[in-house]
Swiss-Prot record:
It comes from Lactococcus lactis subsp. lactis (strain IL1403). The keyword tRNA processing does not apply. HAMAP family: RecA (MF_00268). Residues 352-387 are annotated as: Disordered. The gene is recA. Keywords: ATP-binding, Cytoplasm, DNA damage, DNA recombination, DNA repair, DNA-binding, Nucleotide-binding, SOS response. GO terms for biological process: DNA recombination; DNA repair; SOS response. It holds the Pfam family RecA_C. It is found in: Cytoplasm. This is Protein RecA, chromosomal. One of its GO terms (cellular component) is cytosol.
């Protein structure tokens, strides 16, 4: 009986491998010629590149986002109930971008932006690009033009629910306009997603909440504008105010802010479902000292015993508000704790780490020199006593 000849795949690979490699190289060259460099690449060439981010303006939120901030070239959705702090969270991102020398635009579809409050949050209102569109399509077209220019680092749309289609505005109150906004948003997402990625612009869409009628099981809450934004968004944040922050006692007790929970319900660049707790103070926004105090206590950098807070075995205040005031008044201590927290969570870039290492080394040398001087002085005193 004749034996079946075994196929040797190594021989086939050797014979046709060179021809296949040449054919692939020709195809890659043709694609790059027709569609531009970078239109097709091997995944390994870009696998080690870290996702570029822009700070959210909140240390706690940067940590919860995992990557250190909002990813560049991606879409972010911030939603929550009324007066939960959605616009405040977005304005802190605007201030952070401007602080780094970037350009930010704010499309105020709700016509509700308060310039004085934005200024209090650190926004440079003289440099902020502001648009208050008459209808939804106009607002999205303005956003598209800003994004495709490649000159803007951050675009905030406040809010999706206020992006009313022109057909609905031109019609009468009570006219049926089922699906108009969803279709408008779906088309906008298809057009904007590619431009946002190419220009590395971060687009933040603020959204409201609605309730679905007749839901018996699960959450009845939903966001307006259809499902397109949910799919295209790389990050989705659920913002909800929880506990009041009050000062005074008895009848003199007044609310000065609220503890707000920001949950990362979707994240394509880091593990999701992390939570950031921030203190949003009236007229101030997210309290930098408040969030730093909370994180430092969780990390064990600041010790808490009862109502007392201590750093390096030194008491800094009885009660959170007094500890926050201490950090406000002592900028060096604030910066030192802030640096320790950022180092622990890998939020410092290589240059900052190198600079810190150099500073630490210099301080260590200075401390050692001082100790040696003290030793020499002690020896001289002992010799004088012996004489």
């Amino acid at each position: 009986m004749a034996t079946k000849k075994k196929t040797n795949f190594d021989d086939i690979t050797k014979k046709y491998g060179a021809e296949r490699d040449k054919a692939l190289a020709d195809a890659l060259a043709l694609i790059e010629k027709d569609f531009g460099k970078g239109s097709l690449m091997r995944l390994g060439e870009a696998a080690n590149q870290k996702v570029s981010v822009v700070s959210s303006g909140s240390l706690a939120l940067d940590i919860a986002l995992g990557a250190g901030g909002y990813p560049k070239g991606r879409i972010v959705e911030i939603y929550g109930p009324e007066s939960s702090g959605k616009t405040t969270v977005a304005l802190h991102a605007v201030a952070a971008v401007q602080k780094e020398g970037g350009i930010a635009a704010f499309i105020d579809a709700e016509n509700a932006l308060d310039p004085e409050y934005a200024k209090a949050l650190g926004v440079n209102i003289d440099e902020l690009l502001l648009s208050q569109p008459d209808y939804g399509e106009q607002g999205l077209q303005i956003a598209e033009k800003l994004i495709t220019s490649g000159a803007v680092d951050l675009v905030v749309i406040d809010s999706v629910a206020a992006l009313v289609p022109k057909a609905e505005i031109d019609g009468e109150i009570g006219d049926s306009s089922v699906g108009l906004q969803a279709r408008m948003m779906s088309q906008a997402m298809r057009k904007l997603a590619g431009h946002i990625n190419k220009t590395k612009t971060t687009a933040i869409f603020i959204n409201q909440l609605r309730e679905k009628v007749g839901v018996m099981f699960g959450s009845p809450e939903t966001t307006p504008g259809g499902r397109a934004l949910k799919f295209y968004a790389s990050v989705r944040l659920d913002v909800r105010g929880s506990t009041k922050i009050e000062e005074g006692s008895g009848d003199n007790k007044t609310q000065i802010g609220k503890i707000t929970k920001i949950k990362v319900v979707k994240n394509k660049v880091a593990p999701p479902f992390k939570v950031a707790l921030v203190d949003i103070m009236f007229g101030e926004g997210i309290s930098r000292t408040g969030e730093l105090l909370n994180i430092a206590v969780d990390e064990g950098i600041i010790k808490k015993s009862g109502a007392w807070f201590a750093y390096n075995d030194e008491k800094i205040g009885q009660g959170a508000e007094k500890a926050k005031n201490y950090l406000k008044e002592h900028q060096e201590i604030f910066d030192e704790i802030d640096h320790k927290v950022r180092t622990a969570h890998g939020l410092l870039d290589e240059a900052e780490v190198a600079e810190t290492t150099e500073d630490t080394s210099t301080k260590a040398k200075a401390t050692k020199a001082k100790k040696e001087e003290k030793v020499v002085e002690t020896e001289e005193i002992e010799l004088e006593l012996e004489d």
